[in-house]
Structure formats: C-alpha cells, structure tokens
C-alpha cells in the first residue's frame, strides 16, 4: 500500500515521502497513529501544493533576509558604556544590547541569537559583528561603543 508520511518514521520514511509499505503496517500503525495517510490522487496533489507553498515561503524569507542585510550593512549601532583606563569597559556589550539598540534606534528587529558575537565586546571603539540572518545570508553590522558621560 502506498502512503504519504506526515512525520518522520525511523527506518521507514521522512515527512512528505511517498512509499510503499505493508497493508497491515499502514492501516494498523501508520494511519491509526496519524503518522501517514493513504496515497490517493487527492492526497498527492495536496502534498504537491504544500511543497510549492513551502518553496515560495522559503524564497520570500531569503528575499527579506537579503533586504535586511542591505539595511544592516548601511548603519552603525551606537552604544555607550562606562569604561576605565585604556578604553576597557566595566562589564561588556552583549548581543542582547545590540539587538535592543537596533530595535530602538533603527526600528529593525533582529533576534539576539542571530547576532554571532563570539566574545562580548569589552572595549571602546568600532567592532564589526557578523549577523546570520538566513542559512545563505550573513551580514556584517558595525557597532560603535563610546564612553558614557
């Protein structure tokens, strides 16, 4: 019996795959537990429609990530912090602070987890910070930390 997998089933198939399995296994386990549906022509066309929709959404996501990259690379995020001798900060500037500054100063919402700050910024001056917006799109954000008055 041909079935369309709705979820990954270890050793049998991945979500969205159409496979031939034993009738009893299909009826008594896969379909009963909601892991698969019978591969009728209506179900197959619905699956194809869903795949097209997912592909379109992925393309839109990539396009918006590229637009955001363009915006991020044109701006400089200004932050102020208390510092001691030699421009060393008391504490550090974190990815959360950078994300908040982007939200407040430039109305750009970037998840703090996408800001790839290996080590927190601990000194005054300019720092280039990589931002991974999408698996295929990475921007470089300029962050300027200045003395707090």
Swiss-Prot record:
Any one Pfam family match given in the protein's UniProt record, by short name: Ribosomal_L9_C
GO molecular function, one term: structural constituent of ribosome
UniProt keyword list: Ribonucleoprotein, Ribosomal protein, RNA-binding, rRNA-binding
The keyword Repeat is annotated on this UniProt entry: no
GO BP term (any one): translation
GO cellular component, one term: ribonucleoprotein complex
Family: Belongs to the bacterial ribosomal protein bL9 family.
Function statement: Binds to the 23S rRNA.
HAMAP family documented for this protein: Ribosomal_bL9
Protein name: Large ribosomal subunit protein bL9
Source organism (scientific name): Bacillus licheniformis (strain ATCC 14580 / DSM 13 / JCM 2505 / CCUG 7422 / NBRC 12200 / NCIMB 9375 / NCTC 10341 / NRRL NRS-1264 / Gibson 46)
Gene of this entry: rplI
């Amino acid at each position: 019996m041909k079935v369309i997998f709705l979820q990954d089933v270890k050793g049998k198939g991945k979500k969205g795959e159409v496979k031939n399995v034993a009738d009893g296994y299909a009826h008594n386990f896969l379909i009963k537990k909601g892991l698969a549906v019978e591969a009728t022509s209506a179900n197959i066309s619905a699956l194809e429609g869903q795949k097209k929709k997912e592909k379109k959404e992925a393309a839109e996501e990539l396009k918006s990530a590229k637009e955001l990259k363009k915006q991020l690379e044109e701006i400089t995020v200004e932050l102020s912090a208390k510092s001691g001798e030699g421009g060393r900060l008391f504490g550090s500037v974190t990815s959360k602070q950078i994300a908040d500054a982007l939200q407040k100063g430039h109305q750009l919402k970037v998840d703090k987890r996408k800001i790839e700050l290996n080590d927190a910024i601990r000194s005054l001056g300019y720092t280039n910070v990589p931002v991974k917006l999408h698996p295929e799109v990475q921007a470089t954000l300029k962050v300027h930390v200045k003395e707090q008055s």
